Amino acid sequence: INGDCELPKVVGRCRARFPRYYYNLSSRRCEKFIYGGCGGNANNFHTLEECEKVCGVRS
């Protein structure tokens, strides 16, 4: 698994509302969350497909 996918979900400290996806280690799935627009980490993907490709999720 890509190391970025092991990072915790970080919403960020700003107040924007960008729909993003992150890899949830517990469920082993990519899940939607709302990103605030600043801060955060590399476990933050624009699309479900990108998250699944990078994190190796198998359907």
UniProtKB/Swiss-Prot annotation:
InterPro entries: Kunitz_BPTI, Kunitz_BPTI_sf, Prtase_inh_Kunz-CS, TFPI/VKTCI-like. It is found in: Secreted; Nematocyst. One of its GO terms (cellular component) is nematocyst. Pfam families: Kunitz_BPTI. Residues 5-55 form the BPTI/Kunitz inhibitor domain. Disulfide bonds join C5-C55, C14-C38, C30-C51. One of its GO terms (molecular function) is potassium channel regulator activity. Keywords: Disulfide bond, Ion channel impairing toxin, Nematocyst, Potassium channel impairing toxin, Protease inhibitor, Secreted, Serine protease inhibitor, Toxin, Voltage-gated potassium channel impairing toxin. The keyword Disulfide bond applies. The record marks R15, A16 as: Reactive bond for trypsin. Signal peptide: none annotated. SUPFAM superfamilies: BPTI-like (SSF57362). Dual-function toxin that inhibits both the serine protease trypsin (Kd<30 nM) and voltage-gated potassium channels Kv1.2/KCNA2 (IC(50)=1300 nM). Belongs to the venom Kunitz-type family. Sea anemone type 2 potassium channel toxin subfamily. This is KappaPI-actitoxin-Avd3d.
